[in-house]
Amino acid sequence: MSKMWSGRFNANASTLLDQFNASLPFDKELYLQDIQGSIAHATMLAKQGILSQEEAESIIHGLKTVKEKIENGQFEWNIEDEDIHMAIEKALTNLIGDAGKKLHTARSRNDQVALDFRLYVQQSNKDLIRLLANLMQTLINIAKNHTQTLIPGMTHLQHAQPISFAYHLLAYASMFKRDIERFQSSFERNNYSPIGCAALAGTPHPIDREMTAQELGFDAPTINCLDTVSDRDFALEILFNIATMFMHISRLSEELILWSSYEFGFVTLSDEYSTGSSIMPQKKNPDVPELLRGKTGRAYGNLMALLTVMKGLPLAYNKDMQEDKEGVFDSVKNAKISLEILNETLKTMNINKEKMEAATKIGHLTATDLADYLVEKIGIPFREAHFITGKAVALAEQKQKDLSELSLAELQSIDPRIQNDVLQYLDLQHSMNARNSYGGTAKEQVEKQIEYFERFLEELEG
């Protein structure tokens, strides 16, 4: 079968070339964006007198018919059509005749694919913002019920200081807020229309790029046609943003895996979002967070793949750039389902408050509070207080106690200047609520953080 570009060729493309060269098996994902762009283009061509109104109406009606056929499963895909643009144009021409051949006036596949792909990425930015907002709201809802639930705050996966479970969850809410802001920033930066750039240098036809930009929901046309058809930084941005988001998801997933183990027992994942073993009847495996952790590597790979594709390309379009889409489609689809299932996993898990609070009674979590007491009440330098507290911890270890369980007499054996008021400093709830500096774990600060994040989500929705 001859191609639409076959005029200068003396032989048909080989079947092997069709198999190697065609992007249709994956870029048919862009059918909706391709049709949207073509409708806007035809509308503009008619307004500019390049097409007659009758031709434009025939084209638009035909494109809507093609869309219905695709969505009803009646469209016949043929790899010889090469890509989604040619597949739709051929179907349109077969449907309405010669008017269909005029649609490509003042347009190249170079700006056409840049448009389709950008529309897809922009919609994906909006979808991911919505799903991240849902996840943030779930974290906030859980946090509201646990502003006083103690867990060990850790560094190096070792017990460090007492914090609230709410505070821990809000740390992830803060990360996901920044993820939302990255998607927002990318959307705003890339909300410019490629259509009308043609092959690389614009077109001599009297087109109206401002009109098509407005029709398609863009802020304005892109400023330089050569750049527009040559670069895929908008695709790299969403890949980077997804990779960063997955890094945050992976860290939360790792903690869910740890917390759901017998060794921690902080949470119990619901049966709906757990799996079993084919040989060990007792097993209840945290497959959801494990898969989320695994998919993070895949998101990183897609980012590095496109960076590598783009790094040495001369201007303008090169066929290498056909390799831009599959990784983006893959990352976007994985990101969407990952956000949905993580959200449901969090909503349905059981929180074992008693296990969390029991874990705070080991590991000497109030050691820093003792050092602070020595500085505040006795007036010694912090480094000296640090040393004395270390001696107290060593004594507690020797007596197989937690630091908070040492008696006043035992503490005074380390330093006789310690008085009875030290005991409140060693109380876990007091320790947590004493950290009332801005951004701290005290209940007052956590409630302010909840209010801050809820206000952010309200403004996002508005």
UniProtKB/Swiss-Prot annotation:
Its EC number is 4.3.2.1. Its main location: cytoplasm. Gene3D superfamilies: Fumarase/aspartase (C-terminal domain) (1.10.40.30), Fumarase/aspartase (Central domain) (1.20.200.10), Fumarase/aspartase (N-terminal domain) (1.10.275.10). Pathway: Amino-acid biosynthesis; L-arginine biosynthesis; L-arginine from L-ornithine and carbamoyl phosphate: step 3/3. It is an enzyme of class 4 (lyase). NCBIfam families: argH. This is Argininosuccinate lyase. It comes from Nitratiruptor sp. (strain SB155-2). The gene is argH.
